[in-house]
Design a protein with these regions (language model features):
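Non-heme Fe(II) oxygenase catalytic core, chiefly the N-lobe of the double-stranded beta-helix
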Residues: 2-276, 282-305
Length: 305
């Protein structure tokens, strides 16, 4: 990556400094026995001390504490024992209205809870999980948050990687950033061809395409709650940049994808059985790692509006 694209000092003083671990030492926050500990210098936090039984909700003060932590850190990893699988919907509901996630290329497997679906490696493993993406970025209004619960996890492998698109923006050279802010990108569910793979019948494929036409969005956008700028492009769904030639568009997108993929702005979550997780789908991108062979991996998932 060109050094011209990286400017480590151009950072928002009100937010944790990117690439500065010292800012995170001793940064634990606690309220009513619930603690937040930074997971890495750039994205994520551990949550400890919260217990949900499916009936008694936490106090409103604790709920707001967790919500603010989610906006600040990008994702929250809840320790095993925080919630049982049957109460996962309660955890998701703390952050908004939970609903079933369904996409045209991967129809949802519905759990007993109509707001929760299952990702089961013994039922289906899809390549799209191993490409950096924002959930449903092909829609005008993707879910605000995504939540997962590890019901069955491999003894090794099967991690989930997260990257912070706001932190990636902060690494841009100011001149390049200003140019990017003038551009618009096209996002399409068919960018990687997964819709064609899912629907072999031409009429059915055409019907699905009609339901999910390409959409346009600013290449650099403001987070609607924090007001911070972020790179809004992802490998799975971003097709091209309007107004540029094919080669120029692809070249510029690769520069942005390199920033998104940079280890400087990402972290890796190793699953344990019973781990629950929620992330801000508007600024945090993710991808799976398919290194667990034939081991069983079963996660519950909900998206939150």
């Amino acid at each position: 990556m060109s050094a011209l694209l990286i400017e480590e000092e151009r950072l928002d003083a009100a937010q944790p400094r990117i690439l500065d671990v010292a800012q995170y030492l001793g940064a634990t926050q606690t309220l009513d026995g619930v603690s937040l500990d930074p997971y890495s210098p750039v994205v994520g936090a551990h949550v400890r001390g919260l217990r949900l039984d499916g009936q008694t909700p936490p106090s409103e003060a604790v709920r707001q504490f967790l919500y603010a932590g989610l906006l600040r850190y990008g994702f929250l990893a809840f320790e095993p024992g925080t919630v049982q699988a049957q109460h996962f919907g309660q955890l998701a509901g703390l952050f908004g209205t939970a609903r079933l996630m369904n996409t045209p290329h991967t129809p949802a497997t519905r759990d007993n809870d109509n707001k929760v679906n299952t990702i089961d490696s013994q039922v289906k493993k899809t390549r799209m999980n191993y490409i950096w993406h924002i959930d449903q970025a092909f829609r005008n209004a993707p879910p605000r948050f995504t939540a997962l619960f590890g019901q069955t996890v491999p003894a090794f492998g099967g991690d989930t990687l997260f990257t912070n698109a706001t932190a990636a923006y902060d690494l841009l050279d100011p001149l390049l950033a200003r140019y990017l802010e003038t551009l618009t990108a096209v996002h399409d569910v068919e960018t990687q061809g997964f819709l064609t793979l899912a629907y072999q019948d031409a009429a059915e494929l055409a019907a699905q395409r009609a339901k999910t036409p390409p959409i346009e969005a600013p290449l650099i956008r403001l987070h609607p709650e924090t007001g911070r700028k972020q790179i809004y492009a992802n490998e799975l769904y971003t097709q091209r940049i309007l107004g540029l030639s094919r080669s120029a568009s692809q070249g510029l997108l690769e520069v942005l994808f390199d920033l998104i993929r940079s280890p400087d702005v990402q972290t890796r979550l190793r699953w344990q059985q019973g781990t629950a997780l929620i992330w801000d789908n508007r600024t945090v991108q993710h991808r799976g790692v398919g290194d667990f062979g034939t081991s069983h991996r079963r996660l519950h998932r909900a998206v939150i509006e």
